Amino acid sequence: MRFFIEELPVVFPYDFIYPEQLAYMRELKRGLDKRGHILLEMPSGTGKTISLLSLLVAYLTHHRAEKHKVVYCTRTVQEMSKTMEELKRLMLAWHRTVGGSAVIDDGDTQRSASDVKREASDGAAATALLAAGVGKTPFAAGRRRMAESEVQKGSLGGELTAVCLTARKNLCIHPEVSALTYASEVDAACRIKTARWSGGTSKCQFYHGDIEDLAPSFTLPPGVHTLQDLRQLGEARGMCPYFAARHAIETADILVVSYLYIVDPKVSPVVRKHLRANSIVVMDEGHNVDDVCIEAMSLLVSKSDAQSARDSNVKMLQDALEQAKTHNRQRLQEEYDRLVSGLALTRLAVSSMSGAAREMPALPGVGDGGGELDALPASLRHANQFVTFISRLADFFYRIISRMTQPQTADPSTFIAKIKEDCNIVDVTHLRLTTDRLQVLLNTLQLRDLYAMRHLVIIADFVTLLATHYKDNRYALPGYVVIFEPFDPQDAINRPDPVLRLSCVDASMAVRGLFEGHHTVVLTSGTLSPLDMYARMLGFVPAVAKSFPMTLSRRCICPVIVTRSTEQADLMCEDLTSAYKVRVDDRLQSGVSRAYAGLLLQLAQTVPDGIVCFFTGYKYMGEVMLNWYHSGYLRELSRLKLIFVETQDVAETAEALRNYRRACDIGRGAVFFSIARGKIAEGIDFDRHYGRAVVMFGVPFLPPDDRPLKERLKWMEAVLGITDSEFRNFDAVRQASQCIGRVLRNKTDYGMMILVDRRFSLPDKRKKLPGWIAQQMRDNTNLSTEACVSIARDFFVEMAQPWDQMKDLGRTLFDEAALATQGAMVQGSEPPELAARRHATPLAIGAPIPTAAEGGGRFPAAADGSAMDGPSRPIRAARDPTGTEQRRAAAGAKRGRGST
C-alpha cells in the first residue's frame, strides 16, 4: 500500500498496517525533521523493522538531493539477514507501486500478498519479475501521473543501493580460507593471501588490489545485496565479496552492519570515515547498546598473553628485523625517511598495509590529524629503538601480572605513570602511537603470520587506548579503570590465572563521537523502559522519546507474576525466589525447585506445543535440573514433552534448537531450557507454536562479585547519579522483558508470559516493565502456581476459538480505506485527532473529559478503551460523555446522606 506521513509518500509492502506502525513512523519522521536523536520503544511483534525501513526509504527517496546515508545496526548475522530480506521485499513493493504504475494498464491484476512474499525471497526471481512487468498494481490516473513524475525525476526508491557489511568469515569464497573454523583464523589467512608481497599460488585469486584501486566493474549495481547475493556476485565476477562490500560503503545509500562497525574502535573507522553529518544511524534492538559499548571499549591481557608477547612475539620481531637488515635494509631506510619527513603516522600505517590488513586501524582519538599525535618522537622512529621499547613494554606487563596475588584497582593516571617510568617514555602522547607504530613495523618487515602476533598487538592496543582516554574532558572522573585479578572470572574452576583488565566504565565513550557528529541517531527496541535511563548512560538528549502502547482486539498475550507455591506448609510466600539467601539454604532451595517443577509439569499438560524456560544462569539452571533429576521430575516431564537444553557450546545449542523446532513441528511438543543473557535470549524468535509460553525462573540480576561491574556502578553513582540498586533492577527487568518478549512476533500470534519470582511483584521491578507488557498484566501480579495454571487454561481455551482478523479493520488493523479516514491518503494531511487537539477550545469547568477516540490524552487508546497518559499508566476513558449518570449518582448519594 501507499500512503502519506504529512508530505512524505511512504510505500508499505503489505496490504495492512497496525496503528502502532503508523504512530511509530509519524514519531520517527518528526525526529528526522527536527534533526535530533530519537528514542522509541515499540511493542514486540508489531512490525518495528519494516516500519523503520519503510519510513527511512521514503525519507531517502523524498530528500534525494540532500544525499542522506542510513547506517542500520543489528546485533547478529541472523538479524542482518532478516533485515536485508525485509528491505528486498520493500524495494520490490516500490517497483510494483511506483515504478510499475507508470507503464501498465488498468487491466493488470494484483498478486496476492503470499505471492509477493514468495517472489521477494529470491533476489534473482524478483529481478526477473520486475523486468517482465509482472505483479504490478494498478492505480488511479492521479496516482499514475505522480508515479510518472517521480520516475522522470529519478526519485524511484528502487535506485537505492543497500549492502550489508560483516566479517570475512561470512563473506569469504576462497575454498581454503572459508573452510577455517574461527573468524580470527579466517582474518589471518586472508591477510596473508592479500598482502602486497604475496605472490604465486599463495595469492588470493579473488583479490584484485586495494579498495581504492578497484575497477568500476567491481562497483555493485543499485539494489539490495544480501550476504548470499554478494557471494553469488563474487563467484560470478571473480571478485572478493568482502572487498566489494567495503568498496560500496562510500556510494551505498543504506548500510546494514553489526554494532561493532559503529562502536568498536578497531573497526569503526571503516564505516565512520564515509559518514557525513546528515547521516542517519539506526541502532535496532538497542536495549543492550550500553553493554555492547562497554565490551567493545574494554580489553583483557592474561598472563599467557603477556608471556607469549615477551618470549615469542618480541623474538619474532627481532629475528625479522635482523633478516631485513641483512637482505633488504632499503625497506627500513624508506620507513625511517617517511617518518622523519613528517608524514602522519596513522596515514603511513594505513598506506603501508595490504588491503586486508587495513582493518587493523588506529584506536579512537589517534590519528585525528593533530600535530602532537602525528609527531612521532625520535626515540621511536628507528625500528631498533621501537623494538627495544615494545620489548620493555611486554616485559612490564608480564612482571605486573605475575606478581598479582590479590584483586587491586588502579587509577589510569597512576598506571600510565608507572609505564612511563619503566619504559623510559617522556610524553604520554607518545604512548598513543604504539598501535600505529607497531602496524607500520609489521608491514615493513612483511611478517606473514599476523595471527601469531596477536599477543603483542593486544598489549599495544591496551596502552594506546589507556593513553588516549586516561583523562576525560566531559566528566570529573575518567572513563577507565585498570583492574588486577588473580583469577580469570571466565574460568569456572577458578584456577590461578591472573589477568589485567582495562575496564571501560563510561558507555558513552564509544558513541560520543556518533551523537556529536551526526544529526540523527535512532535508538529503538521493544524493551527500552525506562527511556530516560538510556539517555543518561549514553550521554545524549533525545529530540523525540516515546513508548508506544499495544492495541489488541483480543488479549493475545497474558503476562503473569507467580509469587508463591501451593505448598503453604513447607514453602512460605516470601521464599519463592532465586535470591542468594534461599539458594544457600538446602531446605528452602529444595522447596523452590519443587515449586518450579510442579508449575512446569502442570503447564506441560496445559500449554500446547513449545514451552521456553529461562533461568538466571548456567549454574542455577544446573542446580535446579539436578534436583529435578534426582526427584524424578525430569522423567515425568519427558513423558509430556521432549526436553532440550542450551549449553555453552554453540554447535550443541544450534542442534538442540533445531531438534526443538522439529519436535514442535511434528506435534510432539517440547520444553527448551535456556538462560537469560544467553545465545537463545537474544535474537532467536519463538513465534507461533514454537513458544506458546515463556517462563522466567528467577530475577536475572548481574553477578554481585563482578569487579568491573562494581567499578562501573561506582562511576555511574558518582557521575550520573544512578544508584547501584537502580541500575541492577533496571538491567534485570530489561533482560527478563527481552526473554519473555520472544513469545510474540505478530498480533495473530499468542502466548503466556510467566515471571516466577516474588521480587517481580515489587514496585521497583514492576514499574520498569515495558508499558505494553504492564498494560496487559492487569491484576495478575501476585499469583500462586495453581492460580497461574488456572489462568493458563482459560487463556488457551479463549485463544482456541475461531477469530477473524478482518473484524479488526479500523481499530487494531488498517487498510487503505481505514487510512483514508486517518487522513493518510492525502499528501500534507494530519491525523484527525491531532487536528482536533490543536483547534480544540478550552474545557469549561465540569465539562466531560474527551475520550481517546475524541482526541483526549497524550497517547493512543489502549486495547480496553482506556487512554494512555504515559507508557504504562492507563487512565479509564469517560463512559458518560453527557454527565447524566454522574449527576444521578451525586443526587442519590445526597439523598442517602439525608436519610441517615
Pin down the residues of each PLM region.
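Conserved pre-motif I regulatory segment
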Residues: 1-41, 54
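A substrate-engagement module of RecA-like helicase motors
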Residues: 2-11, 15-16, 63-255, 260-263, ...
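Walker A/P-loop NTP-binding motif
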Residues: 29-30, 49-65, 85-90
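A contiguous, basic/glycine-rich beta-loop/short-helix subdomain that forms a polymer-engagement track
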Residues: 227-252, 263-273, 421-578, 592-594, ...
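SF2 helicase catalytic motif II
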Residues: 275-306
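Conserved interdomain hinge at the start of the Helicase C-terminal
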Residues: 513, 569-616
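Conserved RecA-like P-loop NTPase helicase motor core
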Residues: 563-591, 644-762
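Conserved helicase motor "Helicase C" RecA-like lobe of SF1/SF2 P-loop NTPases
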Residues: 613, 618-647
